[in-house]
């Protein structure tokens, strides 16, 4: 269905599938008040910046592709596949799974759990009131916040950003952080980090208690820094460097044969 709204608001509802192509490129902005399918899928393509108020396909898939920027106030679907050449912002998403690709900025928020098969943009910001699982994160900078646990995987580097969650699990085929800059983490309890390259992480919690960290690099250095008491366990790297503002308890720490193990703590150091 080709549509030329001429800059006016669009509302489309159907019992089954919706396939819409908004062809207007002259108004500068496509405004869609509502897209709703009771028992089918929704597929929308636009040629310019697009604003969507509500998009619902609770029993189907939601697909949007735009050549410009895209904002969606409310997205409720079984699965979502969203692509924007510019920035992409989803203010509230409820979906079993999400694939989202943007050029500059990708921003996603949910009052539920967030399961993303793919999040890709120069900068990715995601916030979940529940658990957060990202199967593939491709970005130069990530800002991730979850009230529950965060489980993040990338087939590339995760070089910079901040991640805050109850527990954090990170797995990268490349680096986590850089040699010059740490990946900033804040957890209530535990961090597990695994990388094919280097690991440089700083856990920033200052609340009373301790942080438990496991960090494993296949081929490169591991650097860990915390503000409070640290339990570092099952950690290995070419060189392992550990600094904590509290007590340090180290369990099963391994540097390479010609590598260096360096530990510094404001309080006691206990090595098991």
Predicted regions and their residues:
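Extracellular lectin-like interaction modules
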Residues: 1-272
């Amino acid at each position: 269905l080709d549509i030329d709204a001429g800059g006016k608001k669009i509302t489309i509802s159907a019992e089954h599938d919706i396939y819409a192509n908004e062809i207007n490129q002259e108004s500068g902005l496509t405004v869609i008040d509502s897209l709703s399918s009771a028992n089918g899928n929704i597929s929308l393509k636009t040629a310019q910046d697009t604003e969507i108020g509500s998009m619902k396909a609770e029993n189907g898939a939601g697909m949007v592709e735009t050549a410009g920027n895209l904002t969606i106030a409310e997205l409720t679907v079984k699965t979502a596949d969203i692509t924007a050449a510019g920035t992409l912002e989803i203010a509230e998403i409820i979906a079993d799974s999400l694939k989202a690709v943007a050029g500059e900025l990708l921003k996603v928020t949910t009052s539920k759990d967030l399961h993303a098969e793919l999040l890709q943009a120069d900068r990715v910001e995601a916030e979940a009131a529940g658990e957060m699982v990202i199967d593939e994160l491709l970005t130069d900078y990530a800002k991730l916040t979850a009230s529950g646990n965060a489980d993040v995987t990338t087939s590339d580097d995760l070089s910079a950003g901040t991640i805050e969650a109850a527990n954090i699990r990170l797995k990268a085929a490349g680096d986590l952080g850089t040699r010059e800059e740490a990946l900033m983490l804040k957890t209530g309890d535990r961090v597990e980090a695994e990388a094919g390259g280097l690991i440089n992480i700083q856990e920033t919690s200052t609340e009373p208690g301790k942080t438990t960290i496991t960090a494993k690099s296949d081929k490169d250095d591991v650097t860990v820094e915390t503000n409070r008491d640290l339990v570092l366990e099952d950690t290995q790297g070419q060189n392992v460097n550990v600094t904590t503002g509290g007590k340090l308890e180290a369990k099963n720490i391994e540097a390479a044969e010609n590598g260096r193990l360096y530990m510094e703590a404001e309080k006691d150091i206990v090595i098991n």
